[in-house]
Amino acid sequence: MTLFELVKQTIQVLDAAEHYGLQVNHSGMCRCPFHEDRHPSMKLNERYFYCFGCGATGDVIDLVARLFGLSSFEAAQKLA
């Protein structure tokens, strides 16, 4: 199993988002950190995120890579 597969199977997007400071509401929505967002427009679930405002989308590795300006490999290492 690769590092990417391991991270994606063991760490949920919701958990990572909350761990890194995003405030996710009861319906899995939060304010998108990738654009100025006054109201929650990013939907998160266990496996992916999607912003209805700016179109940002991806899995847990993509989320952490974008949050911290990392490569996918660096984000996977940070999550491992």
Language model: regions and residue ranges:
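N-terminal structured subdomain of primase-like DNA metabolism proteins
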Residues: 1-80
